């Protein structure tokens, strides 16, 4: 999305972070909907002085940014000395055992716990927060409202997309380097033709449905 177009849309700001005071982290997860791969979460801990103003123009809800813009924002966030980042994930095995909601909560908790300093407050995207070692506040649509949550959404998205691209080199028939495990026609066709990998979420209804179609075709 071009800068002028983004400028006409609502952009996230750091109002909630400034109102909270103290050390504030934004928390978000990526990967609830895919048929394969982990769910990944990030926690972005801001310096006490707040969100660095020179980065604000790069940051938006990761879903609104193209891959190149996400990569630029990702690199800038990692290079910013005042910002610290924690990454958490829940595996396909954990997703199958816990269900995707609870696995997402686990990934977010792990992300916060892996910060070098536990914040005073975590701003968590959505309407439900995991049990955390700090106070938590849910912000519905937070990745479009809060800079810290938007930053976390970018970190989680880039980390997960790159992990799926690496897996795609081992399992090239599903198009994961392009679809990141989401149920695109190419991914669904690959699953129906070639069956699942150890990275597929076989507890998901759509995966079971596609595998049943594969079995019917074989019979």
UniProtKB/Swiss-Prot annotation:
Top-level enzyme category: hydrolase
Keywords assigned by UniProt, alphabetized: Cytoplasm, Endonuclease, Hydrolase, Manganese, Metal-binding, Nuclease
Cofactor note: Manganese or magnesium. Binds 1 divalent metal ion per monomer in the absence of substrate. May bind a second metal ion after substrate binding.
Domain RNase H type-2: 22-219
Pfam family for this entry, one: RNase_HII
GO molecular function: manganese ion binding; RNA binding; RNA-DNA hybrid ribonuclease activity
Known cofactor(s): Mn(2+); Mg(2+)
Catalytic activity: Endonucleolytic cleavage to 5'-phosphomonoester
Source domain of life: Bacteria
One biological process term in Gene Ontology: mismatch repair
Keyword Repeat on entry: no
Entry function: Endonuclease that specifically degrades the RNA of RNA-DNA hybrids.
Family the UniProt entry places it in: Belongs to the RNase HII family.
The protein's name: Ribonuclease HII
Organism: Granulibacter bethesdensis (strain ATCC BAA-1260 / CGDNIH1)
Lineage, top ranks: Bacteria, Pseudomonadati, Pseudomonadota, Alphaproteobacteria, Acetobacterales
